[in-house]
């Protein structure tokens, strides 16, 4: 199989897909190469249309007016503030106007680093005539999906249920009562041979609204009712969750069926990193180590991670991972970089190192965090959301996807002309790097995936040979080749700094910041790197200082980077959603285990209490995605039921509840965990691969967690040695507790038995509690390591 591939195909809306194998429930968000560029879904018939090219679009007129989005904080909304469209932000003003004027609402949802959102704005929303059509016939509302995931999820559910898939930009037409009746993703501006254009869609919807309004309203109500029934998740008459062993086995088998033996990963291109799947495979391996399936699960996960890290989906020059690969080989990515990918991948590469002992994986994890520190970090400790895929090749030019990341042979030769001393043939540093990373004179990007010729002659770096093979090819020592390549990459990095940069979305989201706190805490603890744990602590302090309302105990969803390093808030604040609480609580629990600072555990307990009050469904079990009051206008109140690019907040919450029960002994949290798993058991039974994170938690709940208690002085060397021993080993189903002997401490008040534990011979001592049994006291790190490996 050739390693030649191509840049992201120029079609379809942007997708943050799940990369799940075929057969996963509601997993059709990933971009499908064979789909047309326009998806239209409707509760009433829509006429077919034709094809269009972006080159047919008339150039946009210079901006004449500023719309009301200029008063927003969201980078995505601000990108549309100079459109001729009379945009409203999501809110009562727009809803009241739609009802008063009896007009349908045109809702457009996207995010600031979305390539196809940029395309639609450039082609349609900047177009004066299209702007006039929108303003005269609709109330136009723009939503940043990252600010309002509840709005996005409700209407994406409609689009996915009534069409072949979903993506962004998502464009939906609503009744004045906010019920959807037509929806789609990216629309080209004009009709072509096979696709309907946006202008035509607008005119036909106008006609339908005038001529068949009652039919549209009836159909919309019927579809909404059907979606409500379909999305119902409830305990029902089930008493206990499904069998973990059965769910585990079925989930593994479904993953095994979709596994790519040669390149790793699951399903067909485009390929997504899917950390939730890799987490599941590692957990499955641990509980099935002595079986063939267990070995297979480990091999699948490690091979996938190695192929991803060697592929072009990793930025070999500046570190960090791009959103997904457009090809089977992980070569040509969609170049956007998302914070949530960096957070989850840093953890899963750290786990790969814990399991394999291969420093390769640790280096990748450290590289990811280096990228986040350098590019996605606010100086006050918070983390930005994303970097765009598009940037101008040169200043003053139109942005192109991937321009910041690709290289020509000529550029590399000019930057790295030095001869390599000791090579078996004449060789420059540039030639060595190009050989190792697969660069060619004509470029290594296939023209079939670059239809506009924007990346002709360009190259995406991808490791083509092992260090050993490259060294043998030129008669060099492996370490010499490693040093030469690292020096070369650093020179490329310094040169790349002078290119026009991609747009940085400096919005900070509580949920993704929580994931990133986990990333720094878990990696720092496992690798014994205190500076990474310190960065996790800074992130948690940022969350508490800027994204937590002390008076109400609630999290805020967003804040924004202001001028001069300041932090700005929206007014009124955007309050947190379920995922904000779930991911922040997980981050705080991981940070407590990494730092042993009990204040983070205390805050996690308070946030969990607030989460339970705001989102728990006392009748059906599980958590709703949004507060009842915040989502009161929406036609659906949903429960997140799929682990995708990010884990489901219900999956994460189930594991949080399990850990909190072990940290505190509070039975009500175990009861909630069991109730949640029972509510989702039918989803897991039907398609376990759609909820691998929840299946993993189900196993942990039925096997029980280990309580690893270390009695000792937190600052003493022997205590630190035992802590580091625990951190260095892959033990996912555990809680780590430091008992310092103070009966008045927070943890001793939660778990009174901690006060009765004693150090042996005044040395730091470990006790392991599992299945209501306690191990013999352990003081030797080697003995502890042996026991944890059993």
From Swiss-Prot:
Gene3D superfamilies: 1.50.10.10, Glutaredoxin
Domain of life: Eukaryota
Keywords, comma-separated and alphabetical: Developmental protein, Differentiation, Phosphoprotein, Secreted, Spermatogenesis
Residue segments, region Disordered: 1-67
Protein name (Swiss-Prot/TrEMBL): Spermatogenesis-associated protein 20
Modification Phosphoserine occurs at: 5, 653
Function: May play a role in fertility regulation.
InterPro entries: 6-hairpin_glycosidase_sf, 6hp_glycosidase-like_sf, Ssp411, Ssp411-like_TRX, Thioredoxin-like_sf
Recorded name of the encoding gene: Spata20
GO BP of this protein: carbohydrate metabolic process; cell differentiation; spermatogenesis
CDD domains reported for this sequence: SSP411
One Pfam assignment: Thioredox_DsbH
GO CC annotation, single: extracellular region
């Amino acid at each position: 199989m050739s390693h030649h591939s191509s840049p992201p195909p120029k079609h379809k809306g942007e997708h943050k897909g799940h990369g799940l194998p075929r057969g996963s429930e509601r997993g059709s968000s990933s971009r499908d190469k064979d789909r047309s560029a326009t998806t239209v879904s409707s509760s009433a018939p829509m006429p077919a249309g034709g094809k269009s090219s972006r080159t047919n679009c008339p150039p946009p007129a210079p901006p004449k007016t500023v719309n009301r989005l200029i008063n927003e904080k969201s980078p995505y909304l601000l990108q549309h503030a100079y459109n001729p469209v009379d945009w409203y932000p999501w809110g009562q003003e727009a809803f009241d106007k739609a009802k008063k004027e009896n007009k349908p609402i045109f809702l457009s949802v996207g995010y600031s680093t979305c390539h196809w959102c940029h395309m639609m704005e450039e082609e349609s929303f900047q177009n004066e005539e299209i702007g006039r059509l929108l303003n005269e016939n609709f109330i136009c509302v723009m939503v940043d999906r990252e600010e309002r995931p509840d709005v996005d999820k409700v209407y994406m559910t409609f689009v996915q249920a009534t069409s072949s898939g979903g993506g962004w930009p998502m464009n939906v037409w609503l009744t004045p009562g906010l019920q959807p009746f037509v929806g789609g993703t990216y629309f080209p501006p004009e009709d072509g041979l096979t696709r309907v254009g946006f202008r035509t869609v607008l005119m036909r919807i106008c006609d339908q609204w005038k001529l068949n309004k009652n039919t549209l309203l009836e159909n919309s109500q019927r579809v909404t009712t059907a979606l409500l029934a379909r999305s119902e998740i409830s305990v029902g008459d089930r008493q206990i969750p499904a069998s973990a062993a059965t769910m585990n086995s079925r989930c593994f088998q479904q993953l095994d069926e979709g596994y790519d033996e040669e390149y790793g990963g699951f399903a067909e291109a485009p390929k997504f990193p899917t950390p939730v799947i890799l987490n599941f495979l590692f957990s499955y391996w641990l509980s099935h180590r002595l079986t063939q399936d267990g070995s297979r699960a480990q091999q699948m996960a490690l091979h996938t991670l190695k192929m991803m890290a060697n592929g072009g989906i990793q930025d070999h020059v500046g570190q960090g991972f791009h959103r997904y690969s457009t090809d089977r080989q992980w070569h040509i990515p969609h170049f956007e970089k998302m914070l949530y990918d960096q957070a989850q991948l840093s953890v899963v590469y750290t786990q790969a190192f814990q399991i394999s002992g291969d420093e390769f994986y640790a280096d990748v994890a450290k590289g990811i965090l280096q990228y986040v520190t350098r590019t996605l970090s606010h100086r006050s400790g918070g983390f930005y959301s994303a970097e765009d895929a598009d940037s101008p090749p040169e200043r003053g030019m139109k942005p192109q996807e991937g321009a910041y990341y690709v290289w020509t042979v000529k550029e590399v030769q000019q930057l790295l002309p030095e001869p390599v001393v000791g090579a078996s043939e004449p060789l420059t540093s540039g030639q060595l790097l190009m050989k190792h990373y697969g660069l060619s004179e004509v470029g290594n990007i296939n023209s079939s995936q670059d239809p506009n010729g924007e990346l002709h002659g360009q190259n995406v770096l991808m490791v083509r040979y092992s260090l050993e093979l490259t060294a043998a090819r030129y008669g060099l020592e492996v370490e010499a080749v490693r040093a030469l390549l690292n020096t070369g990459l650093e020179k490329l990095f310094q040169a790349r700094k002078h290119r026009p940069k991609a747009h940085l979305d400096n919005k900070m989201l509580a949920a993704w910041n929580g994931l990133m706190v986990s990333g720094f805490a878990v990696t720092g603890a496992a690798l014994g790197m205190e500076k990474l744990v310190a960065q996790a602590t800074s992130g948690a302090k940022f969350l508490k200082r800027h994204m937590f309302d002390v008076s109400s105990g609630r999290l805020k969803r967003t804040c924004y980077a202001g001028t001069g390093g300041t932090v700005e808030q929206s007014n009124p604040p955007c309050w947190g959603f379920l995922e904000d609480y779930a991911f922040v609580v997980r981050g705080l629990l991981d940070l407590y285990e990494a730092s042993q600072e009990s204040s983070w555990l205390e805050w996690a307990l308070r946030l969990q209490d607030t989460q339970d009050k705001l989102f728990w469904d006392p009748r059906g079990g599980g958590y709703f995605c949004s507060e009842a009051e915040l989502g009161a206008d929406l036609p659906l109140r949903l429960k997140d039921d799929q682990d995708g690019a990010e884990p489901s907040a219900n999956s994460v919450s189930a594991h949080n509840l399990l850990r909190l029960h072990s940290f505190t002994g509070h039975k009500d949290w175990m009861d909630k965990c069991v109730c949640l798993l029972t509510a989702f058991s039918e989803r897991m039974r039907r398609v376990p691969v759609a909820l691998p994170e929840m299946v993993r938690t189900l196993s942990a709940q039925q096997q029980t967690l280990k309580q690893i208690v270390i009695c000792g002085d937190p600052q003493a060397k022997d205590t630190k040695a035992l802590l580091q021993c625990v951190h260095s080993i892959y033990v996912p189903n555990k809680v780590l507790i430091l008992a310092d002997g103070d009966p008045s401490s927070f943890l001793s008040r939660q778990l009174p038995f901690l006060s009765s534990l004693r150090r042996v011979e005044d040395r730091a001592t470990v006790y392991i509690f599992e299945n209501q049994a306690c191990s013999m006291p352990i003081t030797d790190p080697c003995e502890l390591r042996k026991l944890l490996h059993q």
